[in-house]
Amino acid sequence: MNERGRKRVLLGTVVSNKMDKSVVVEVERLVQHRVYKKYITSHKKYAAHDETQLCQIGDMVKITESRPLSKTKRFRVSEIVKKAV
């Protein structure tokens, strides 16, 4: 299979939109503990590029991997799945 054209797509929640054209998205995933085999929720925060500046805190967004846009930004907001209440 061709791995070169495949880009990671992650689903997460916007936790910060204070920057200009950037948001911080927190992605949750289940990870199994190596010894105890219990599933634990792990969190990771990604800086993502938001060109339209429509994302608000609490929105559920889909982010797609892209070329490096800055020191920390490697993702773009591809769509807003669910708006915050």
Curated annotation (Swiss-Prot):
The keyword Ribosomal protein applies. Pfam families: Ribosomal_S17. GO terms for biological process: translation. Keywords: Ribonucleoprotein, Ribosomal protein, RNA-binding, rRNA-binding. PROSITE patterns: RIBOSOMAL_S17. InterPro entries: NA-bd_OB-fold, Ribosomal_uS17, Ribosomal_uS17_bact/chlr, Ribosomal_uS17_CS. One of the primary rRNA binding proteins, it binds specifically to the 5'-end of 16S ribosomal RNA. Part of the 30S ribosomal subunit. This is Small ribosomal subunit protein uS17.
